[in-house]
């Protein structure tokens, strides 16, 4: 590799993030627990500076670094800006929640920033090894974050289960990558795509490797039948960690899947589309039916996430229009989930965790504004117009219809109607059930509550004017496809 091929400028945001993270680590080591607020502010500043660097090096078109192993294009830039915004917002939500529970420590912020670095590498990968390194950096940080609350047996169990299954998925991914390399002789996505057109490429070995890669992608997205870690992780981890696990990594996983399957394995689109159809149908069915039976709202949101991932998998089947719809859906889902978990964190006052649906009973009688924000989240997740969630589902279904997938579209609509039941049940509990206990003052600080309001109201604003975000997604994919 020539030094001229490095071209660090496109990768400057990751360099800045890593540099600031290295400075934050010893600062946290020397700071006492009661001064962790400076680590909090340092983490917020790190994310803000990284976003500013990304904007400073923003340019149209696609550029690469490290001899094509790192790619900066419209999709990676948009995804990273959303990841930075989500991480910043979740740090603000998490501060008061973590302070009460004794987990307001530097580990939360440093591990979260390492996860952010891993996600940034994933979305900019132009090579299988780059994608794998980013994925492992994200996964290792999440394993430790989930077990952050050392006094919780549920957290330890969830972390162990996620670690074991995650290690298995990583092994399958590596095995699939080795088969792709054996079939094409390349690990660079563009090289794999070019080599797969060659008659000398081993088609059967390529397709066998594809199976292992799709399994790994399905695990990271949480699609059925590789979803069993999600309910335990969502339930066992502190809500501040659940919010992080359930939002930003999903966007990174969607872009990761796009890089590998569309950019690298586009020639076998028919094969992985068939697998995605089966995974999507199973995810929609199992996710919605299992969510109906839940009494714990975090487990309910875990199963609802499974159904949302089913919609994203359907979007991948619909070609270029579907890819834009899938990216839009991922951004919409992340905004909805961040707002939903944010409300739960604010309502978890003192040692009382707001985890069960019954904990929301009569919320409108005590916390009118928070009940309204949660109503917006539930309505958006259910796909009720004119909220953002409606246009996300509508975009995917229209993309499917344009490709002739009528039965899949009908099935998705039916499953959306089934899913609306458990979302509306939460609204019914908040507005029509009587609270069985007196409500103490809600947790959270003014910054968290204000940002939460903006987060939830964006679901309305971008629902009324959805074309703004849709155009962002379409333009992001222009120089990628």
Swiss-Prot record:
Compartments it resides in: Cell inner membrane
Topology in membrane: Multi-pass membrane protein
Segments passing through the bilayer: 11-31, 38-58, 74-94, 103-123, 128-148, 163-183, 208-228, 241-261, 272-292, 300-322, 332-352, 368-388, 404-424, 450-470
Chief place where the protein resides: membrane
Entry GO CC: plasma membrane
Annotated Pfam families: Proton_antipo_M (PF00361)
Keywords associated with the record: Cell inner membrane, Cell membrane, Membrane, NAD, Quinone, Translocase, Transmembrane, Transmembrane helix, Transport, Ubiquinone
HAMAP family, sorted: NDH1_NuoN_1
Purpose: NDH-1 shuttles electrons from NADH, via FMN and iron-sulfur (Fe-S) centers, to quinones in the respiratory chain. The immediate electron acceptor for the enzyme in this species is believed to be ubiquinone. Couples the redox reaction to proton translocation (for every two electrons transferred, four hydrogen ions are translocated across the cytoplasmic membrane), and thus conserves the redox energy in a proton gradient.
Name listed for the protein in its UniProt record: NADH-quinone oxidoreductase subunit N
Annotated organism of origin: Neisseria gonorrhoeae (strain ATCC 700825 / FA 1090)
Gene giving rise to this polypeptide: nuoN
